[in-house]
Amino acid sequence: ILRYRQEHPSCALWAEKLLDGRQSYEELWAFYQKYQEQAPLFYSAGASEPLMQGEEESRRDRWAAAALERTLARLAQDALTQGARRLIVAGGETSGAVARQLGFEGYRIGDSVAPGVPVMVPLGSPQVWVVYKSGNFGEADFFEKALAMTGPAGEK
């Protein structure tokens, strides 16, 4: 993420700000619309402070994770609806949330960006390229490589 952020617009999603309304979907969507031609990155920034102490901490953390996943899934869906042709999604839970939101019935599997991380084309949507990556692994240039392998420039 750090390397990609150096050359592309990026926007941090803050769990506690999403939960308490200090960060809105509309603000995030406006960022996407402004930078959509530059392949913007949305990423979870984590918590800047403990969300809550004590017994409620685990439940609050689950709410925070769910808020991040829902928001990123909605951004992905809306981006595709507005004409985006490629999505690169990192994080196991986030990838799952995005895949469920998009609802594709299957994928044609293409070349691998990294071991176990293929470029996929949804069945019935040959103009769309998707990469789902789980876990904190991969080379520092993963996002650049995935971007180069998706979309018109990635066609062979």
Regions found by a protein language model. Name each.
Residues 1-156:
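Active-site catalytic microenvironments in core metabolic enzymes, especially phosphate/sugar-handling
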